[in-house]
Amino acid sequence: LLGSTSICSKEWVWEQYDHMVMTDTLQSPGGDSAVVRIHGTKKGIAISTDSKPRYCIADPEEGGVQIVAETWRNLTAVGATPLAITDNLNFGNPEKKEIMGQFVCCIKGIKKACTKLKFPVVSGNVSFYNETNNLGILPTPVIGGIGILKDFRKHISYGFKESGDTIMILGTTKGHVGSSIYLKEIEKKEEGAPPKVDLDAEKQNGDFVRKLIEAGMITACHDISDGGVAVTVAEMTLSKKIGATITLPKKKNIPSYAWLFGEDQSRYIITTKNPAPILKKAKNKRIPLYVLGKTGGDM
């Protein structure tokens, strides 16, 4: 899965560009969001772009919801408060009813998520007639989001920081593998509905994570996306070459492959040196939080 085109490192692209102009870059490409500081202030800006054509072809409206939610989640994962988005809507020939249907439903999903998350669209553009030999591209709405950090020194990155930290998963895991990378790459199937986004849980979980980051209670944070829990943890280990040992919960209704590679939404992997107060806070707010394991070990 780590070698698939959707998940593999894109470093060969971004390393060719100067992403350290004026040395304001606090978090370089490869993480959940890029973070840059604002001169003369303590503020920072976080930026993220996201798209999921495979979700949008399976369910255009739910795909529209998901890409907005993931952009919101990526900004949250570095400690930023999401402010607004711009959209770039790429589709095939709108004279075909099915293509226009995809377009309309994606917009409905984007509107639904933006309204619930208070994440307004401030600009955007539309590109139609993207096709070759009468075959259109997958519905490809792209969302670019921006967020603000009141104090850039409190931003957080996704990589494990040191051995001995407790790894936790925040959010509800149901083992949804429909339209997942696992299904495509391992089972060689492209089918099933994409995971449904619970926007109430999305907002609650994200607001909680942001408060943990603001309070300095966690050492790393990464949203769970393509490839599920296993890929998310693997990416966190690769950042600083610090390993991890994890134990899956004993849930008879969720197969191990679905627990590891399912792409349920509204989830994060976080690490901390002191899990007890975080577990207590999560319990008080009825936010699902499970201790997954510990960092440590050579890569």
Residue ranges and their predicted role:
Residues 152, 163, 180, 202-204, ...:
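In a subset of proteins, long, contiguous C-terminal domains/tails are tracked
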Residues 2-175, 180-191:
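Glycine-rich phosphate/pyrophosphate-binding loop regions near the starts of catalytic domains
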Residues 1, 106-109, 113, 117, ...:
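Glycine-/charge-enriched secondary-structure boundary and capping motifs
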Residues 209:
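Phosphate-interacting basic helix/loop segments used at nucleotide- and nucleic-acid interfaces
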